[in-house]
């Protein structure tokens, strides 16, 4: 790996360095004699009242620090430390700077000043040595700091650079603006300093006024509060008691209403609660129902002793009665409505009547299976008659030596669809007695079985039904439980292929009241709306900390892993800054990728009340019991209303009042529900998608079925449909009037058919800090390429690690824990190329649209080091290890004359294609149910598209999309989108034309999407106007080029230099 730092632009003005040092030493702004400017004064704060001298002294101190900071940071991106500032203050004010001084400055204006201790090891990683040649190195390394400390205080001034950074990003593509830091002229430096001085002066005025209104002495209040909140190094041997804010960890949790009232009354509250969206679900009383058959007294006693259950709710009783009457049952009710009893009671009663009875309990995740197994065993422990009944887990973690014993003697098996597919069905003869005595087959969380995974599971269950019938058993019953979904009856019919089903879609269990709050982040600066809004992550961090302080047990849902870890990191930083160390161990993150042991530990701590908060992805949407929760915070819309409602249902699971907070983001779907909040409660859920006509997937499962039992067309058509004969003739081998697997699938077809889009070639991430060698998590190759390259800053449980080594052959990644304030962004591009066309259609004249086999290749060739303002601190090259995906997709070859038209307008052709692709992608969920990144496109890299030298990466003028899940046969999603290309393009044109944004890079309302937040695409190379022209011309619509401004390219050559004709 080679490191290439950004070269700093050198000044030709020999006096520049002299002036720079002069102002650093004096802490002054040079003011021209012919244009004097009046310096800010404090005397106008309040008439007839003297200003305490401490504030006047602090204002002078701030001006010196501000001048020093601005020159150092904006010129060289230095990390500004306490020793560095102390040197300047001593020279200018002839006094020593103290940490108490800085704490007082922060107390007056916390929105500008941030103080954090950082380890010397992390600072060493940030130092770009070549920019310190003219400075005393002791100023940075801190020889004045106690040699016993491993930490140094870092100062950051936030207000001015935050807005200017955002403005720079809006002026043009990120790479054009930031690939090399432009030299700031002297006037810009003066403006930055003056603006911050004015902000601090205003902060003093507001601080004194607030104290006067509350009849507090401003000086005494400042001294008390700044001493209380003074930053302390993490390795300090002792922390003064008065410096740690009381977190009220031993007090009773406040009520939801008290919590909301307190939030709204705080000075930091900026009207984030959307009043017209407030909604309260009233408390509901229980309704009970009677079972049609009496339960044994032993089971009645066990239910009462283990769960305090004396009678069944009406929906439970109705479902159980349907099962006893010979029907299959689908239960689609709200979260925490007691669905598990619907299958637990019948199987326990059946075992009392016939101890040879068996049952499969199938769950989508191992953690959910273990949770439900524990619940069932708890009831069984009070039933002595069933003491010999064996309940076991049969999954990938089950030891090989234990499996035969489980097959022979288990009555109830907890498993997952993967084990059914890969182990149980291919070895069906060993399971003869289990299938023969099967009474109940439970498929929990049915809403999970959607899209490509749902199709796979549907075919697996048809294979299971075929085996059971072969062994002479067709009397067992299916029970499927689900969150509230649209048309659950039809969904169960598709999953199981059966008809005699009864639907239970009403809830009769009691529930506490639930308050729904929509939280709209405020503008960074209300006077400058173009600067955008405060991030949803920072708003969530403040809310979560507030809830935890009040002992309100909370779960925060994030769409992607990156958001989950970013939030956890921010929470840890804020808790350290605020000296609330008691809460650090009370909040944890939870997501896929963590080891099983780590997740079980977090689940247990939450269940036992040891945690006040969990930050999670949708891994905790499912019904894992983590105890009683008081509140849910959802960051951004989670792909579907069903997901959103499922997340809201996690709070109030013990009949308590609860709170659901939805923090809206700037993406189109969030803004839609912000304008129409009532639809969150009234709009029907989107239908789940199961495309059982996918002949490629069916053919692969027929290979597996033929291995389990030879296929007979006449008898097996009822399981697999009337297309079975054609598929068998084309893909399987005829042997003695029945079909057997094709030889290429032998010796074991199931091993070649993966039902989940999870790679078997996982990488192991290992923490090697202090030689501890602890496994952190397992990562898929695609995720490794994007987040775990050598040198990357990787976030785990809110802690930052540097990736030290990526061993491709051994699939091992080593990481070292460090405390850094910067992060890394990969420099990457993806090539997506057609391999073979399977279908073709013509759209409006001569434009062809193709569907077929594609290959996607991800290249990560380096990374940027960036600070919190997204300024690039360093550029690093790394060795590229391409990741390839074979899939299915569709593409549109853009005629070259369209690209030439764009070039005449000096509009970048690659940016236009990229913007058009994302405009279409953002609309596909209207026609296809998918989980965010199931369909992807070829993304452009700003570093490649905008560099001045001739680009070696010239791509065809083509819009292309591919299935990112499934195997080489795809997931069927692009096939469906291919059928709607005309509608998609028409809708994209309407969306772009109706969007009010004025920037060429577009906004979340037209051409950008939530895909950018997870690091899948940087969103650098976009041109909204070019996308509109391109899409219109594809539909042969008239385009008046005169109404569109020319693009940013210098000439027509530069506008198309990275493209070649697609055909």
From Swiss-Prot:
Q: Where is this region: Disordered?
A: 224-243
What GO terms in the biological process aspect are recorded for it? interstrand cross-link repair; nucleotide-excision repair; nucleotide-excision repair involved in interstrand cross-link repair; UV-damage excision repair
Q: Which reaction does it catalyse?
A: Couples ATP hydrolysis with the unwinding of duplex DNA by translocating in the 3'-5' direction; ATP + H2O = ADP + phosphate + H(+)
The knockout outcome noted for this protein's gene is:
Leads to hypersensitivity to DNA interstrand cross-linking (ICL) agents mitomycin C (MMC) and cisplatin, in response to both chronic and acute exposures.
The segment(s) forming the Helicase C-terminal domain are 539-717
Q: Which SMART domains match?
A: CDT1, DEXDc, HELICc
Binding annotation for ATP:
333-340
The EC number(s) attached to this protein equal 5.6.2.4
Q: Which residues form the Helicase ATP-binding domain?
A: 320-503
The UniProt entry annotates the motif DEAH box at 444-447
Gene Ontology molecular function, alphabetical: 3'-5' DNA helicase activity; ATP binding; ATP hydrolysis activity; bubble DNA binding
Assembly and partners are described as: Forms heptamer rings. Interacts with rhp14.
Please state which protein family the record places this protein in.
Belongs to the helicase family. HRQ1 subfamily.
Q: What is this protein called?
A: ATP-dependent helicase hrq1
Task: State the organism named in the record.
Answer: Schizosaccharomyces pombe (strain 972 / ATCC 24843) (Fission yeast)
